[in-house]
């Protein structure tokens, strides 16, 4: 993932900062992980994975 792109991308729901981990962009506040496919972030809520509380604590 391009570092410059990561600096300008925000969560589409809360506009918070995202973390890049293992082909996903993660919003800790909303507990959502947005997939990155072929280096293209998919920033759609319906495509995001809900992060379980146990996993959120490890981020």
Swiss-Prot record:
It holds the Pfam family Trm112p. Belongs to the UPF0434 family. This is UPF0434 protein lpl1884. InterPro entries: Trm112-like (IPR005651). It comes from the Bacteria. Coiled coil: none annotated. GO terms for cellular component: cytosol. SUPFAM superfamilies: Trm112p-like. The lineage of its organism: Bacteria, Pseudomonadati, Pseudomonadota, Gammaproteobacteria, Legionellales.
């Amino acid at each position: 993932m391009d570092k410059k792109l990561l600096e300008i991308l925000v969560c589409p729901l809360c506009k918070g900062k995202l973390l890049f981990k293992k082909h996903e962009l993660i919003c800790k506040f909303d507990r959502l992980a947005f997939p990155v496919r072929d280096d293209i972030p998919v920033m759609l809520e319906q495509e995001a994975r809900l992060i379980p509380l146990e996993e959120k604590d490890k981020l």
